[in-house]
């Protein structure tokens, strides 16, 4: 595919993740933006819920591995497995996760260059969505994403990542997969390098909060360049005073979309993704600031789960369609200044013999060149 913003080969994405009737998480958050950006998207839903689980109640059904295999068999029988991309988010159980790896192998028999973008959803904020000691029990979490078995970490690490081209873990998921604690740039580089060694050529840590600076939010991106080395940079993103389910799903879908247009320019793609997500979140925050809804969820302590209250708001995705189609980002003349004005900064990190050298570029023309 060309790297000039054109798409000479029609991309077709198979998106396997959650679905809700009301709201925007999982496929509901991912499919619309990909279609707006010119991608054909086929959808396979791992759950079908009334709403995301941040609400006080939800109902619905979960897909089994047998059901997924049956659907994929139907596609295969009709010679419909010609996909250029596979995108996965929330999966739900180890058997289903393994069935997805089998599906990817079938896709690559049809198209060996099929690109796999994996969001390895397992937890956030220092905890699994379901704690290991509860086995297959279910705890209501703020996120749509509920994981139900501790061995998921091993399956992702040993079976999924070797097949993935791009992964988008959050800080906690990156720590689980790399078996490291992230506290610094050096830690992030080392963790990304460990994940590169497992298979993915691009690792994007979609959120990182410095231990002593909880008000700051960073994104790390690393691209393997061979011989155990990688090019790494980070972006500081403004933290809004609200939590919106579905932003991670939106992020991964946008990254897939913009890397389709710019496969050789990770920095440009990510700048565009961040600008878009920020625009959607700001539009959502502005629209809902006068009508906030708080719901009861549960936070885990060292010995139990205690109730807490979070603001739950649905992304204004439809209202943000022009922000998605025509993002103010690096590829537009006014994009550099707008991104900097929004508070986004870019820092390039390089490593030489395990030493970290930081280059902070303050000029918009340099940052986004």
Task: Set out the residue ranges of the language-model regions.
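Glycine-rich phosphate/adenosyl-contacting loop at the front of the ribokinase-like
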Residues: 1-63, 311, 316-337, 342-345, ...
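Glycine-rich, highly charged phosphate/nucleotide-binding loops
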Residues: 60-76
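Short acidic, glycine-rich surface-loop motifs adjacent to enzyme active sites
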Residues: 82-93, 119
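Short Gly/Thr/Asp-enriched flexible loops that form oxyanion-binding sites at enzyme active sites
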Residues: 95-106, 215-218
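A short helix->loop->beta-strand "cap" motif at the edges of active sites that frequently abuts
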Residues: 107-116, 198-201
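Conserved phosphate/ATP/ADP-binding segment of small-molecule kinases
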Residues: 131-232, 240, 259-267, 275-276
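Short glycine/threonine-rich catalytic loop with a Thr-x-Gly-x-Asp
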Residues: 237-255
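Charged C-terminal helix
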Residues: 267-369
């Amino acid at each position: 595919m060309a790297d000039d913003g054109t798409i000479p080969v029609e991309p077709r994405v198979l998106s396997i993740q959650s679905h809700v009737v009301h709201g925007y998480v999982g496929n509901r958050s991912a499919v619309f933006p990909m279609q707006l950006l010119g991608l054909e998207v086929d959808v396979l839903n791992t759950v079908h819920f009334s709403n995301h689980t941040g609400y006080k109640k939800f109902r619905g059904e979960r897909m089994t591995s047998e059901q997924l295999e049956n659907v994929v068999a139907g596609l295969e029988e009709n010679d419909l497995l010609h996909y250029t991309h596979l995108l996965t988010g929330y999966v739900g159980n180890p058997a289903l996760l393994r069935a997805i790896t089998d599906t990817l192998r079938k896709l690559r028999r049809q198209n060996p260059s099929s690109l796999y973008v994996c969001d390895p959803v397992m937890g956030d904020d220092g905890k699994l969505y379901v704690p290991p000691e509860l086995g297959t029990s279910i705890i209501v979490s703020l996120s749509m994403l509920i994981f139900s078995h501790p061995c998921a970490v091993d399956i992702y690490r040993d079976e999924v990542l070797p097949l993935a081209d791009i992964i988008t873990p959050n800080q906690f998921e990156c720590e689980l997969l790399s078996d490291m604690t992230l506290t610094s740039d050096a830690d992030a580089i080392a963790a990304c390098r460990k994940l590169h060694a497992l298979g993915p050529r691009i690792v994007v840590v979609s959120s990182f909060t410095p231990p002593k600076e909880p008000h700051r939010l960073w994104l790390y991106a690393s691209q393997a360049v061979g011989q155990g080395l990688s090019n790494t940079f980070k972006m500081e993103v403004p933290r809004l005073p609200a939590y919106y389910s579905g932003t991670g799903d939106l992020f991964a879908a946008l990254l897939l979309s913009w890397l389709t247009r710019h496969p050789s320019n990770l920095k440009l793609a990510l700048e565009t993704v961040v600008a878009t997500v920020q625009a959607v979140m700001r539009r959502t925050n502005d629209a809902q600031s006068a009508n906030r809804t708080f719901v009861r969820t549960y936070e885990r302590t060292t010995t139990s789960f205690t109730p807490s209250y979070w603001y739950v708001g649905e992304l204004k995705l439809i209202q943000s369609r022009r922000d998605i189609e025509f993002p103010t980002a690096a590829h537009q003349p006014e994009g550099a200044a707008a991104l900097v004005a929004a508070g986004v900064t870019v820092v390039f990190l390089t490593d030489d013999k395990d030493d970290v050298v930081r280059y902070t570029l303050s000029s918009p023309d340099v940052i986004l060149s």
